[in-house]
From Swiss-Prot:
Keywords: Cytoplasm, Nucleus, Ribosome biogenesis, RNA-binding. Residues 188-240 form the KH domain. SUPFAM superfamilies: Eukaryotic type KH-domain (KH-domain type I) (SSF54791). One of its GO terms (molecular function) is RNA binding. Component of the small ribosomal subunit, ribosomal RNA processing complex (SSU RRP complex). One of its GO terms (cellular component) is cytoplasm. The lineage of its organism: Eukaryota, Fungi, Dikarya, Ascomycota, Saccharomycotina. This is Pre-rRNA-processing protein PNO1. Pfam families: KH_PNO1_2nd. Residues 48-62 have a biased composition (Low complexity).
Amino acid sequence: MVAPTALKKSGTDGQTAPGPTGSRIVGTDNTRSIEDDDDILIDQEDSGAAAAEQAEGAREQQGVVLDAEGKPRFAAAASVAETRVKAESRKVPVPPHRMTPLRNSWTKIYPPLVDHLKLQVRMNLKTKSVELRTHPRHTTDPGALQKGADFIKAFTLGFDLDDSISLLRLDDLYIETFEIKDVKTLHGDHLSRAIGRIAGKDGKTKFAIENATRTRIVLADSKIHILGGFTHIRMAREAVVSLILGSPPGKVYGNLRTVASRLKERY
């Protein structure tokens, strides 16, 4: 007779009822005998070596090779022959009084844009604007669209074609625009006399300022556009401002001679 305090044997199927600390996942044998633990040995050095081998294998697959000092060796970067430029477009409005010069000079305007900057360009007569667009395959300069827009803008402001093309060849040229009223508030005949003082007889004063400061000046009513380098624009602006404020032309010419001598010494 079995003692009432003896442990009951498990069923014939060999399964054990899950205890309070057993796994709650059904269908797997989560019990392990104590003898199995003798076969499981964890060595820190072995695990470190295995991890190092795995890391080295992964680096070799990724193309990373370490030298004797442990520094990575990278393959030389492949030279990129062409830079991809995303497709962009720009519209440059053309004033009505510049449409006729634009049509007459169109055969000389679009070749620098198409051949040099690799842009797509067309004249839209309906909207009275020049449309520029980059091509992802042919355009290589990221700043080509801005250069083309500046070139067309300079021509629409009244600059000659050769002076406008210089914006494409040189990177240190700028255009500055200001009005006479920004310097001094003038109306009526006083404004007309100020414009005449800047231009001079037959444009001699304007040409003298341009030659002395190596700039190009356009007088468009009360607006003044100056094309040139940063320092040259500042010198030309000072001469124009002096004429607007009422300085005698002789004094302005003397200052221009001083400016011209300084530029010769600098360059």
